[in-house]
Amino acid sequence: MHLYIAEKPSLARAIAAALPGPHEKGQGWIRCGKGPDAATVSWCIGHLLEPAEPARYNPAWKKWRIEDLPMFPEPWQLVPKDSVRLQFKVLEALVRKADLITHAGDPDREGQLLVDEVLRYLGTKAPVKRILINDLTPKAVARAIQNPRDNREFRPLSHSALARQRADWLYGINLTRFYTLSYQTRGEQGVFSVGRVQTPVLGLVVDRDNTIEHFQPKPWYRVEATFQASEPEADQRPFIARWLPGDEFQDHLDEENRLLDKSVAEQIVSAISGRPGRIDEARFRDRPEPPPLPLSLSALQIEAGRLYRMGAKDVLDTAQNLYERHQLITYPRSDSRYLPEEHFSQREAVIRAIARVAPDLSGFCEKTGTERRSAAWNDKKVDAHHAIIPTVRPTPNGKLSSAEQKIYDLISRFYLMQFAPDALHREGRLTVSVQEYRFRATETAVIEPGWKTLEIRKREPGQEPEKAPLPRLEKNEPVLCTDPQTNERKTQPPQHFTDATLLSAMTNIARFVADNELRKTLRETDGLGTEATRAAIIDTLFRRDYLFREKRFIRATDKGKSLIAALPESIRTPDRTAVWEATLEGVRRGEEDPRAFLESLKDEIRGFMAQAPAAGLANTETPGTAIHCPKCRAPMVEREGKFGAFFACTRYPACKGTRPLEDHQPEDGTSQKPVPCPHCFSPLVRRKSKKGWFWGCSNFPGCRQTVDDHNGRPAVDLRNST
């Protein structure tokens, strides 16, 4: 039997549709064709297996105890996930019957692993082929089916994903337990959830918030002067130029080359007023600008965040709908901005489809010449998947939502740009010497918009307008300085992060790294997280109540700030994590050993545990006596309200949890030290149902973990996990 294993049901249906009939549907499978050429298509539902919990390796590890740390499993174990156990059983039976298996996971790191791990777990001896499907339209799927590759070619990709999975387990579970237990011994409350990627991302937000909070504006001075040609036959148009600080003024400048000393500015103005000068440099040119490449997921999220203020997860979910439900775009979780050269032959069909699905772009589609070939088509730059582009499908499955239409239009615009002419900029520069000072004026103008007619323009704060044309003067021509001025300005704090700028920071993490050598290395890597995980990382920080939104800005909660303050710098900064991502990329390319990477990580975890945690939080409660919020488990304080005294959450207004005053310890367990959820590490909260007391995750409905109650404390055995 030939068995195809897809990553998800929607992909399985697309594969079945491309295989010959008749089709027979069963529970968790689709049979295609008859006789010896028949094939069966089944699917995973994301990861069917998950890393075993600590207690699976050692029953003593179920209880959180500092003496059991660090926990390094050997050998590693996977267990079927309860929520998808039925589909796992279906797939297990099919794999055991198969004499040929085709791996059809998504064309990325996780897509490779989630099918590979099932095959390894079941110990199949059948040969395994691999197909890469970036486009769910029938012709594209059929093309992929006809071009299978040996799955062994993708072993390094699978090793990279497996190393990432194990690194997350080692780092997250060990350090979360270590820092939680360390602070609880000091009377602190709550669970200190530490993640290999999420913690440095939170650190970026906390550092930005702290910078803004402690920012002290300082005055700085810009010296400008108006110049005009002295000779009557020369171009007499006046122009404004800015002073260029020389090396002798470095002591009066800040790190951004701004003048901080007003007396120096006044001295310059006095020295040049009415004085003759000379053109030192006159440069004018027309500069072509090629179109930007098609979009990767991060580029799409950044653009959509900037233009439409869409959150990273919203963009990903919308793109996933366009891919799976409507089949209007190619695989959305791509980190590539290049296209395979063979795809160039489909350009006319894609452009016709864009004109149908996005009527607002039909005029551009009609004018687009299809002979131009931008730098995007380059096989050498394409790996498992290519840039996100529209498919040849001309109609959606039903009406597109407003968000879906915006994302489709955005992807289409960047595709159409590949056939548009270069934009042409006219640039000019005049450098003037007057006395011992130098001034410079610049000119910028778009004289032929080219691909920019497809660009959605949105003026960014602080963006300077196009500069007026300069007079056409030549080197050594005399000029006269008139109306020199000193303009006082104030330094401005940076803005709080938005979805777009935080994603940009994660993809360009080298900007936030202090070490010069490390920064140079990181410029070659993808930064923190991957295309497929960045939105989920940000979402996790919101769900764990480390971040909150203030209009379009992302801010850190007090809980998030406390966590970062409590951790060593090497855990809360991006340096080490970004290096790990670079190492994982090396594993993917077959250049790094995943075992060496994990051994190095174990050494680092031992090093963290050898250091005493910093005192990040002030203990204001007597251990064991504090009342904690039933919603977020933060400490509560007594407040006076309209109807008398009550307990209120100290995190108000971010959390509006309250509880009445009681003469005894509350039955819901909020007077006890928080116990972490075994699934997501959020605090457990005691709740009452018709059958009696139980403990549920405070992160409900994001996490539905429940634990039995045993004499007012969470029991060891789990009652339910989904």
List where the protein language model places each region.
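Structured, non-catalytic alpha/beta "coupling" segments that mediate domain-domain communication
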Residues: 27-57, 199-248, 416-468, 600, ...
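Glycine-centered, phosphate/nucleic-acid-interacting loop/turn motifs that mediate DNA/RNA or nucleotide
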Residues: 326-327, 545
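Basic, low-complexity terminal or inter-domain segments flanking catalytic cores
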Residues: 2-3, 84, 121, 176, ...
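C-terminal or mid-to-C-terminal helical accessory/interaction module adjacent to the motor/catalytic core
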Residues: 140-225, 285
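A conserved hydrophobic secondary-structure block that centers on an alpha-helix together
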Residues: 106, 307-311
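Intrinsically disordered, low-complexity regulatory segments
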Residues: 1-169, 173, 493
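Metal- or metallocofactor-binding catalytic centers and their adjacent structured scaffolds
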Residues: 251-293, 575
